[in-house]
Amino acid sequence: FMLMAKPDQTGKIDSKAEFIITVSWPDFHPDDIDVLVEDPRGQVLWFENKDTEVMHLDRDDRGSFHDQLIIDGQKISNPINQETVSLRAWVPGEYVVNVLHYKANYKEPVPVTVKIEKLNPEISLVYYGVHELNRIGMEVTAARFVLDNSGQPKSVNSLQKSLLSRLGPKA
């Protein structure tokens, strides 16, 4: 008797996400950009709090730090700079999406792209924009969006709101 998985079920990963927030900056850029997201309950997701009941920081990218691997004696670099947040569920109310220039290696501004997508029942774009960060500690509100009781985005704006200041001295 041999137990084998059905071929059509191998490698299947059931991931649940209602919204995806993607923050990216130029490939191979050494700076560390962070995403901070506040949900309607006031919980803030960021690199020190990677999981709430509603949101998860799927990828925390630190620029070029730890982007090299040795595979078969060859040094391989991952050029992609990207942070990803999944909203596995949603709570009605306002969400705030901020980007933070956590570590800078150059004086030139870094263009940071923020994209918010609603995934269900079909993929739709909630927000897309590019923001320039030009110094360590610079925090910018990319988007604030409100979800109604059915999970539909009803309004989007970029009225500034600091989330870092709410996190206290640890930040």
List the model feature ranges, each with a label.
Residues 1-171:
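Intrinsic-disorder/low-complexity signal
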